[in-house]
């Protein structure tokens, strides 16, 4: 019998992920299963609106970035080894391009990642889950 590896991402990506470039901003390795993602506007609040996809599934739909975070949490425990998070600009706000700060909290570690997206380019983060043995 042959082993079939589970696909990292769901089989059919939405058009917004295939018709724009998905620019890899950062790759993070995590041994902790609990991941928390918070998204804020970077700088001036200018009505930037984003969507966030986790392995091709929309998890934040047309969220408006401001000083209060848009929050998404997930557990890597039973899921794919690689977790692809893609930030999509739904508009450019009043001051293009669409800019965001993504704060990724893994265990006690916190990382701030600066993201830029527009109508041609999405921002991608990959979190590789590698549990301690």
Located regions from the model:
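Terminal leader/tail segments of proteins
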Residues: 1-133
């Amino acid at each position: 019998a042959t082993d079939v590896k589970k696909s990292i991402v769901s089989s059919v990506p939405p058009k917004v992920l295939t018709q724009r470039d998905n620019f890899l901003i950062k790759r993070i390795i995590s041994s902790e299963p609990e991941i928390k993602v918070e998204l804020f506007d970077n700088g001036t609040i200018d009505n930037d609106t984003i969507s966030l996809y986790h392995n091709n599934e929309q998890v934040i739909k047309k969220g408006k970035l401001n000083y209060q975070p848009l929050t998404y949490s997930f557990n890597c425990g039973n899921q794919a080894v690689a977790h692809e998070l893609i930030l999509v600009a739904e508009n450019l706000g009043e001051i293009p391009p669409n800019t965001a700060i993504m704060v990724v909290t893994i265990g006690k570690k916190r990382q701030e990642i600066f993201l830029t997206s527009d109508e041609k380019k999405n921002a991608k983060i990959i979190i590789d889950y590698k549990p301690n043995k």
